[in-house]
Amino acid sequence: MSKVYDWFEERLEIQAIADDITSKYVPPHVNIFYCLGGITLTCFLVQVATGFAMTFYYRPTVTEAFASVQYIMTEANFGWLIRSVHRWSASMMVLMMILHVFRVYLTGGFKKPRELTWVTGVVLAVLTASFGVTGYSLPWDQIGYWAVKIVTGVPEAIPVIGSPLVELLRGSASVGQSTLTRFYSLHTFVLPLLTAVFMLMHFLMIRKQGISGPL
């Protein structure tokens, strides 16, 4: 076993990486409120795992979406638990993100030289809200349908580009299959990918600059 480790160590310098990860200085003023960002990340990972599990049963069509969600909740093994955890962790993720934003703002964590860390955090907040909007519609029940209709209709008030923007969001002139397909693609692929990229940027900046000091 040691020979295998030595082979990887010689090529990847695993010990140096481990030492760098475990040797970062943690300021004495850090308390439990500095864990809110990490809790948000944990909720996101739970979302990814449970969401991936549900893709095996969910059908993104206007005729089968609601029935597939019912199947997940009533017939699929542990489907009710997986979907419930997905919903609970979604609510927890939003709550932890809001508290994290307040903590960073109140402790001045957005100030120089951490402006870009703050910017990536704001982008992540927008992405998190987008998860809520797109995920809310996927069961394609009455609540989901009318929520999509209202949300996608908001840009229509914008002069000149309002109507084309609404049609872009809906995929057609009215809410239907194209809309559900777009929201499903956004919720399961585009938004998770963007979130993963910006989270990586966010954590690398924190890693480089360290935790902000007290007020």
Swiss-Prot record:
GO biological process, any: respiratory electron transport chain
Chain segments annotated as transmembrane: 32-52, 90-110, 116-136, 186-206
InterPro entries xref list: Cyt_b/b6_N, Cyt_B6_PetB, Cytb/b6-like_sf, Cytochrome_b_N_euk/bac, Di-haem_cyt_TM
Tree of life domain: Eukaryota
Main function: Component of the cytochrome b6-f complex, which mediates electron transfer between photosystem II (PSII) and photosystem I (PSI), cyclic electron flow around PSI, and state transitions.
Protein family membership: Belongs to the cytochrome b family. PetB subfamily.
Official protein name in the record: Cytochrome b6
Organism for this UniProt entry: Eucalyptus globulus subsp. globulus (Tasmanian blue gum)
Gene name, Swiss-Prot/TrEMBL: petB
